[in-house]
A protein has these predicted regions:
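Central antiparallel beta-sheet cores of small beta-barrel/beta-sandwich binding domains
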Residues: 30-130
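N-terminal secretory signal peptides that target proteins for export/translocation
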Residues: 1-7
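Boundary at the C-terminal end of the N-terminal hydrophobic targeting segment
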Residues: 21, 27-31
């Protein structure tokens, strides 16, 4: 067996790194819970103007979830979600700054959350649809 030349070694090393770089993001994406993404819905508090809500959920490297809430109609964005859990298609989150909570169930194709939004003593049905 002939020893590898420096150029051959560099070529093999480059190919190995390219392959690893293409596989690792796919593996990370597979591990992310299906609720990770951007979700949008409309609160309809009967007799009051409708309020659009956008929820952003991301996964940390340790597997924990983080999120923020935007209220586009009020020009408010980035309200922190302080507690968020996802288990067996059930999502629960709470936002202390917004004084709200949401409990929803993810549908089978991972495109819609159907649930209940609670805020300020009011409970409203809220469907969140995946936008990203």
């Amino acid at each position: 067996m002939k020893p590898l030349r420096h150029s051959s070694l560099a070529l093999y090393l480059g190919l190995a790194l390219t392959l690893a770089a293409s596989i690792v993001p796919r593996l990370a994406a597979q591990d992310a819970p299906p609720v990770v993404g951007e979700w949008s819905g409309t609160l309809n508090p009967g007799g009051q103007p409708k309020k659009h809500v956008v929820v952003h959920i991301s996964a940390e490297q340790d597997g924990s979830l983080r999120g923020t809430i935007d209220y586009p109609d009020q020009d408010v964005s980035g309200v922190q979600i302080t507690t968020i859990t996802y288990r067996k298609s059930a999502l629960h989150f709470e936002s202390t700054p917004a004084l709200c909570a949401y409990d929803g169930t993810l549908d089978k194709d991972n495109s819609r959350l159907t649930g209940v939004w609670k805020q300020g003593g009011t409970t409203l049905d809220l469907i969140l649809r995946r936008t990203q």
